[in-house]
Amino acid sequence: MSMSPKHTTPFSVSDILSPLEESYKKVGMEGGGLGAPLAAYRQGQAAPPAAAMQQHAVGHHGAVTAAYHMTAAGVPQLSHSAVGGYCNGNLGNMSELPPYQDTMRNSASGPGWYGANPDPRFPAISRFMGPASGMNMSGMGGLGSLGDVSKNMAPLPSAPRRKRRVLFSQAQVYELERRFKQQKYLSAPEREHLASMIHLTPTQVKIWFQNHRYKMKRQAKDKAAQQQLQQDSGGGGGGGGGAGCPQQQQAQQQSPRRVAVPVLVKDGKPCQAGAPAPGAASLQSHAQQQAQQQAQAAQAAAAAISVGSGGAGLGAHPGHQPGSAGQSPDLAHHAASPAGLQGQVSSLSHLNSSGSDYGAMSCSTLLYGRTW
């Protein structure tokens, strides 16, 4: 069973365009109703607003009713009465309104917006600079009034400023240092008394003592560190073998060693290499004296023995006496001895000479006996 519509839609050009022409005609005829509200709007207060709104509503209702009837007839309506007016360029009496550009150019405010600009590159800036300058001037007036108000207002409480540093006089510093040497810490009464003496406040005295204590501690610490560094450098220099280091030379100069050095030149004259020292000369002279005394005692004993054994034969050989009259070399050596010993030697000299003659005689007799 074929489903065919009862009413066929004509597709010819005349069938399609004829309903549109009729609808345009009706819209044009009924569009005159919109002229009344527009005319009333242009006249301003000639008609009350309520009447103008009522007329506008009636005209709009008529256009909508016409469009509804055309839709029911089977022709689709794609335009409104206002749309038709916009499309055709006029809407009843809307064509009487001048364009927006002409209105703005002819108005009083037109030159402010569209005035002649010397530089055509900045058309948009000129339209904003004019009103902005007036606005800025008015704003500056407001700022000036604010400045006057700020002058009259009391300043806001800010952070406390640091006081200027007070320089103490030499007398004050001397008194503070003298008291610091005596006592590093002061009680409140002592602090007040010292402050009154040197014309300072107790707070200033307190702060000065605190700073000076810290200064002394820091100086002592730096001094100890410096001494420790010097000791470390002096002890480690021997292992490193750096004899030319100035720190090591300074340490050697500070602690010299005493070494016996032979004197080669004294008072500009060269000393003898074998010359004994003064102490050694005194010891040698004492030993010589002891040896001389022992030799003299031995000679005295020998002389006594020779006198007791053969004193009669002394005169048998007188030729030997002249030789005995002279001093012997031993006596010449003893002459250099002290005066006390010279007396003893002189008393025994004749005995020594006689003893020597007797010895010579005995030796000669034996020699003669052997030869014969």
UniProtKB/Swiss-Prot annotation:
Residues 161-220 bind DNA. Residues 245-254, 273-288 have a biased composition (Low complexity). Transcription factor that binds and activates the promoter of thyroid specific genes such as thyroglobulin, thyroperoxidase, and thyrotropin receptor. Crucial in the maintenance of the thyroid differentiation phenotype. May play a role in lung development and surfactant homeostasis. Forms a regulatory loop with GRHL2 that coordinates lung epithelial cell morphogenesis and differentiation. Activates the transcription of GNRHR and plays a role in enhancing the circadian oscillation of its gene expression. Represses the transcription of the circadian transcriptional repressor NR1D1. It comes from Mus musculus. SMART domains: HOX. One of its GO terms (cellular component) is nucleus. PROSITE patterns: HOMEOBOX_1 (PS00027), HOMEOBOX_2 (PS50071). This is Homeobox protein Nkx-2.1. Thyroid, lung and brain. It comes from the Eukaryota. Belongs to the NK-2 homeobox family. Interacts with WWTR1.
